[in-house]
A protein has these predicted regions:
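Long, amphipathic coiled-coil "stalk"/hairpin helices in large membrane-associated assemblies
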Residues: 7-69, 143, 147-155, 161-163, ...
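Short beta-strand-turn/beta-hairpin segments enriched in glycine/proline and small hydrophobics
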Residues: 8-36, 126-143, 168-170, 176, ...
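Extended amphipathic alpha-helical segments
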Residues: 8-11, 68, 72-76, 80-82, ...
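Beta-strand/loop subdomains of soluble extracytoplasmic proteins
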Residues: 9, 173, 180-233, 287-291
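Surface-exposed patches in structured soluble domains
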Residues: 15, 44-47, 134, 141-187, ...
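Structural motif
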Residues: 43, 49, 125, 157, ...
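Structural microfeature recognizing short secondary-structure transition sites
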Residues: 208-276, 286
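Edge-of-domain interaction segments
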Residues: 248-303, 307-350
């Protein structure tokens, strides 16, 4: 039995998933005329990398048509401006001779015609911008650094707007969704607040018989219980998951340290709260009913009720009214009563 100090680990497990994943679908249609050789499942891509290109001829024609229409509208606007100036000058000459107090109508000054010409110019500018945008969309680029999960595009294929031809997931981070009981979630400091710093965590996965770890932190928690399991999903974020993991043992293993693979089932250890008074004991010492059989230097058994804070694979973290010098019985007894005298050996107590 060891008096605890520091943070109690919170253990869980979940499946590794990417922090972001999207379908790749063209926004315009046409025949595919070029495909990046790197646009294949499993390959890494960078933000802005062109994945494939759609034939541009039709879209360039639309741009030229829009440019020509815009040029016509610019000439029409100049003509409308000149007509308006002439109409105003003629009216001023007429009014100065025949009707000095008169007010000219907008139609007389050709103001509606001028506004119509200005609106037509704006409309053609918008059409040109739309044509250029459609042309730019013939080049389909990766929106972020990531990996190709799947692709289904080939040279000569007819691409349809909105129809997915591939899927990418982000390379900057991965997430592990860890379902925890409310008792375990309560051990994570600041889970429901934005105060304080990041809560450290580690994702641990097996690869070729060797266990590897990747550093991470608690990113957030779902605000609703899973209706089936009644657990809280805590999301642990692992930055740079595709870097080599840290081996937790030095004995022989496969050549090269692996990344944290998407879809891998991983264990997670989260740095929990640090209570002021708790004990770490072997899991074998915990008896049914959350009791520990403790024996003092006098060889007398005391049955101590405990509150279990956390259970690990080989140890449990508990609080209870233990006395100085007591050890926990981990074997050698089928039953015990309070006050029973026993003889202890090193392998039977801890």
């Amino acid at each position: 039995m060891v008096p605890g100090s520091g943070a109690i680990p919170v253990y869980g497990a979940g499946t590794v998933r990417p922090s972001a994943e999207i379908d790749i679908a063209p926004q315009v249609g046409g025949r595919v005329v070029w495909v990046d050789p790197g646009f294949r499942s499993g390959e890494r891509v960078v933000a802005g990398q062109m994945l494939f290109r759609i034939e541009e001829a039709d879209y360039r024609t639309r741009v030229r048509e829009a440019e020509a229409a815009l040029a016509d509208r610019k000439v029409a606007l100049l003509q409308a401006q000149e007509d308006a100036e002439i109409a105003r000058a003629e009216y001023e000459r007429y009014s100065s001779r025949h009707d000095p107090a008169g007010v000219a109508s907008a139609l007389t000054l050709r103001e509606p015609q001028l506004k119509a010409a200005q609106a037509a110019l704006l409309r053609e500018e918008a059409r040109l911008a739309e044509a250029n945008l459609a042309l730019s969309r013939t080049r389909i680029e990766a929106p972020f650094d990531g990996f190709v999960r799947e692709e289904s595009v080939a040279l000569g294929q007819l691409a349809v707007p909105g129809e997915p031809v591939g899927r990418l997931f982000a390379a900057d981070a991965a997430e592990v969704v860890v379902p925890l009981s409310d008792a375990d979630a309560a051990l994570i400091p600041g889970l429901w607040t934005t105060e304080g710093g990041e809560v450290s965590a580690r994702a641990i996965a097996d690869y070729g018989g060797i266990r590897y770890a990747w550093p991470g932190y608690v990113d957030r928690a779902e605000v609703s219980l899973d209706e089936r399991t009644r657990t809280i999903d805590v999301i642990v974020r692992v930055p740079d998951p595709f870097a080599a993991g840290e081996p937790l043992q030095t004995t022989g293993g496969p050549l090269g340290d692996p990344p944290l693979l998407v879809g891998k089932f991983a264990e997670v250890a989260i740095e929990g709260l640090a209570p002021s008074d708790y004990f770490q004991v072997r899991r074998a010492a915990l008896q049914p009913g959350n009791e520990i059989w403790a024996v003092g230097r006098d060889g007398v058994v005391r049955i101590v009720p405990v509150r279990v804070l956390q259970r690990g694979d080989d140890e449990v973290f508990v609080t209870g009214a233990f006395e100085r010098g007591q050890a926990a019985i981990i074997g050698g007894l089928q039953f015990a009563t309070d006050g029973m005298a026993v003889r202890t050996g090193g392998s039977a107590t801890q």
